[in-house]
Amino acid sequence: MSKAIVLDSHLKEKGSVELPKRYEGINSHNLYLYVKHYLSSARANTAKSKNRAEVSGGGRKPWAQKGGGRARAGSITSPVFVGGGVSHGATNNRNYNLKINKKQKRLALEYALEEKAQANKLFVVEKIAIKGVVEDNKRKHLTKEANQMFQALEQRDTLFVCMNMDEYTELAFSNLKKCLIIDVSELNAYLLAAFSSVVMEEAAFQHVVQDKTEE
């Protein structure tokens, strides 16, 4: 059974906690479906070309129907003219979103957590809190303290997951390129798969692994 590594206040390993048994044997296809859903939902539908009804001009017939030796033409907005409308071009009314049901979302999240635990990249700490130093009635050195925390983990990049994150902690991690800190309500399978390691507050971890199959 996969286990998450429990860290002490100095980010040193002090034990482990098992993931629920239901996390075993989940099909990886659920994660694939969720990643497709996540990326397609984020796709900006901005591609747009004008058809012959939308381009300007074309109010008169460009030349006489007969006698000129050229092919007949009724409007310069025709797609055969340079500057005319585009046939079968992109439209901005297309919906790229791919549907996925709640069960597949849950299974994708559980599979991603299981993968991190098997790779020994899932860590649990009691609290993630950055307070900094108060100078001149201002909190300073927030990012420095957050970076020290990240460096102590000795990981390539890290996703931090908090339960009820405070503004100072969020601000502290905002300038670190290889870190992202989120509230547990924002956690999803894509973010778990995108980062090489995950650090969760104990309360956030318990919230995520509680049985939601009855919901």
Swiss-Prot record:
Keywords, ordered alphabetically: Ribonucleoprotein, Ribosomal protein, RNA-binding, rRNA-binding
For this chain, one GO molecular function annotation is: rRNA binding
Q: Where is the composition biased (Gly residues)?
A: 56-71
> This protein's superkingdom?
Bacteria
Q: Where is this region: Disordered?
A: 46-72
The record's listing under InterPro entries reads: Ribosomal_uL4, Ribosomal_uL4-like, Ribosomal_uL4_dom_sf
User: GO biological process annotations for this chain's record?
Assistant: translation
Per the record, what is one GO cellular component? ribosome
- What functional role does this protein have? One of the primary rRNA binding proteins, this protein initially binds near the 5'-end of the 23S rRNA. It is important during the early stages of 50S assembly. It makes multiple contacts with different domains of the 23S rRNA in the assembled 50S subunit and ribosome. Forms part of the polypeptide exit tunnel.
Concerning NCBIfam families, the annotation shows: rplD_bact
Q: What protein family is recorded? A: Belongs to the universal ribosomal protein uL4 family.
Its subunit composition reads:
Part of the 50S ribosomal subunit.
Q: What is this protein called?
A: Large ribosomal subunit protein uL4
Organism of provenance: Helicobacter pylori (strain Shi470)
